[in-house]
């Protein structure tokens, strides 16, 4: 399988997806036809989100079709060379994909060789479940099971920082809560600016920041770019 799982879409001082374009170009390998899954973008229309994505990828020669705009979404996915899943609210994303019957077709086409690109919520959707999202559960997705394209859980936008005077939990504390009730999980705290690529059977960490892996009963393990999972 070929996956590009990004923690986030925007970095300080850079345009939207600018940091991801070289990574996307490297993994295209001749693929040019993409379907875009825009449903996580709650505060923007599907048309606007799709147009924004299409404009960014046009210089790479990639044509983007919003899955919401086609007559037969399942057939469009089955024939796609690239599946792109945008960030936003993970619960809304999973709900819409489940209701529209898109989860199995996405899994199947990626396993057959299509490239999967997802940022933030799109990276969460590639995991076994969405239980490591940071998002508010604004809708009920009728279960947390997701695509299971990547075998570990990703927590995108990972940071352990708290504003001065803030008394809420750190991100690690919230991850530790999940590991109490689901000790079988391995959770990757993927900070902004980092990504995971899957190619030729290998998953590789990229990006300038330290990533952390959490397991029940163990100290967090720091990982740097180049680590293979």
From Swiss-Prot:
Alphabetized InterPro entries for the sequence: Class_I_gatase-like, Peptidase_S51, Peptidase_S51_dipeptidase-E
Top-rank taxon, per record: Bacteria
First-level EC class: hydrolase
Subcellular location field: Cytoplasm
Active site: 120, 135, 157
GO cellular component: cytoplasm
This protein's record includes keyword NAD: no
Keywords from the named record: Cytoplasm, Dipeptidase, Hydrolase, Protease, Serine protease
Pfam families cross-referenced by the UniProt entry: Peptidase_S51
Enzyme nomenclature, EC number: 3.4.13.21
Keyword Ubl conjugation: no
Catalyzed reactions: Dipeptidase E catalyzes the hydrolysis of dipeptides Asp-|-Xaa. It does not act on peptides with N-terminal Glu, Asn or Gln, nor does it cleave isoaspartyl peptides
GO-annotated molecular function: dipeptidase activity; serine-type peptidase activity
GO biological process: proteolysis
UniProt function note: Hydrolyzes dipeptides containing N-terminal aspartate residues. May play a role in allowing the cell to use peptide aspartate to spare carbon otherwise required for the synthesis of the aspartate family of amino acids.
Family membership: Belongs to the peptidase S51 family.
HAMAP family from the UniProt entry: Peptidase_E (MF_00510)
Name of the protein this chain belongs to: Peptidase E
Gene that produces this protein: pepE
